Structure formats: structure tokens, C-alpha cells
């Protein structure tokens, strides 16, 4: 999971609100498409939760504070608040035979979360194991990752994909430090590359590599 700095809402949403838009269900398809495009650019075309690649065809708009109309806490104004919106994947719905196969918002439902992609402090509490497992020493965030969002789901390739990204970074470090201890500047360059979008896109599952490089840099 990566920190997402929310940007200005798309002009299409601003105009609809000016024209009296009161709830997400009344929003036009054109405005929803504009929101999807803006969210994708904002998040580097990665799911806000699992960090797999998403695009216009396989993403959905997630309300961080759930806005299901059956929920007594639903708030029409929050349903059209751009700051409450995230782009997420399909939640493994095509490969699911039971609920335990679902991930991200499809597994979450309307359960409140502690971890928040919009809050850098909470994202910094996420850790990873060498096998790609996501966890946190904060019990509430750990529950979000492992249970509510099911981000270590064994019927997906999430853990394997994270491990693959981490292995590439480790191999790069080994190659650069074959003769000497890798320079801090080299680690900073590797980190900067992962944190920079290429053609509006981040590397899928890059969170584990960013976490690893930051940990290495903290020792200098």
C-alpha cells in the first residue's frame, strides 16, 4: 500500500455539484469516468490497497468511508466527496469461489479501516516479510491488512509478486555492492526511481521495495 496525496477533484465533478448534485447514485457516467481517470493518475495506476496494476476497464471507485445505501452511517455528501474516493481493483472477484478468495474492497465490505492510503503516517506503519507478507506492529492496521482487506490471500499472487519486486531490488543492491558497501546516494537513487511515475504509472507492488530501501537508508 502506498501513500496517496489527494489532488484537486476533476472539473466535471465540480460542475455537477454546482448544478445541484446531491449523491453518488445521481452522478453522470461522464463525471464518473473523469473521476476514474483522475484517480488512476493520482495513484499511478495501482490499486489503493493491493498495489496491482489497474486501468479504466478493471477498476472501481471505492469510498474510503463506506457509502453503501443500506448502511445507517451513509452520507450523501461523503458519497460525492472526491477526498473520500480511491481507485481499487476488482478484488479477485473473477477467481473467487468463496469470500475468503476475495480481496481489497470486495472482501472489506463496509468494515471501517484504520489504515488509510490518504494518511502517510498510517502507511509508514506497514511492514513486509521476505516472502512478501504484509503486516503491521499496530494490531488494528495488521487486522486491516490480513483480515479485512485480505492482502495476504493465498489464492492470489500478491505475496509472490511482492517478493519478486523485492528480489529485483536486492539483486540490484548486490550487483552495486560487489566490491564496496553500496553508497547512500545509490540507495536514494533507487528509491527515487520507485517513487517516480513513468508515463503516469508506478511499478506494481512497489510498496515492499520502497519500505525495504527506506529501512536500509535508516542505517546510514
Question: Which ranges hold each PLM region?
Answer:
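Short, charged surface segments at domain edges that flank catalytic/cofactor-binding sites
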Residues: 2-46, 70-72, 76-80
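Short Fe-S-cluster ligation motifs
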Residues: 10-14, 74-91, 119-135
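Short cysteine-rich loop/turn motifs with clustered Cys
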Residues: 34-59, 91
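Histidine-centered nuclease catalytic patch
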Residues: 52-87, 91-100
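Histidine-centered active-site/metal-ligand motif
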Residues: 63, 104, 162
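Long, low-complexity, intrinsically disordered segments enriched in glycines and aromatic residues
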Residues: 97-158
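C-terminal, charged low-complexity interaction regions
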Residues: 140-220
Amino acid at each position: 500500500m502506498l501513500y496517496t496525496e489527494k489532488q484537486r477533484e476533476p472539473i466535471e465533478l465540480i460542475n455537477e455539484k454546482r448544478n445541484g448534485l446531491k449523491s453518488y447514485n445521481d452522478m453522470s457516467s461522464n463525471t464518473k469516468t473523469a473521476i476514474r481517470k483522475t484517480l488512476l493518475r493520482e495513484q499511478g495506476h495501482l490499486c489503493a490497497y493491493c498495489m496491482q496494476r489497474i486501468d479504466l476497464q478493471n477498476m472501481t471507485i471505492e469510498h474510503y468511508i463506506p457509502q453503501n445505501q443500506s448502511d445507517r452511517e451513509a452520507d450523501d455528501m461523503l458519497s460525492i466527496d472526491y477526498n473520500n474516493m480511491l481507485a481499487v481493483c476488482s478484488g479477485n472477484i473473477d477467481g473467487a469461489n468463496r469470500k475468503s478468495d476475495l480481496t481489497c474492497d470486495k472482501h472489506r465490505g463496509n468494515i471501517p479501516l484504520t489504515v488509510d492510503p490518504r494518511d502517510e503516517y498510517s502507511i509508514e506503519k506497514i511492514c513486509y516479510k521476505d516472502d512478501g507478507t504484509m503486516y503491521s506492529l499496530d494490531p488494528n492496521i495488521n487486522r486491516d491488512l490480513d483480515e479485512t482487506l485480505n492482502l495476504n490471500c493465498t489464492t492470489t499472487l500478491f505475496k509472490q509478486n511482492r517478493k519478486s519486486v523485492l528480489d529485483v531490488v536486492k539483486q540490484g543492491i548486490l550487483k552495486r555492492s560487489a566490491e564496496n558497501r553500496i553508497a547512500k546516494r545509490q540507495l536514494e537513487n533507487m528509491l527515487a526511481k520507485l517513487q517516480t511515475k513513468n508515463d503516469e504509472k508506478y511499478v506494481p507492488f512497489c510498496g515492499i521495495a520502497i519500505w525495504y530501501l527506506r529501512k536500509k537508508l535508516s542505517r546510514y
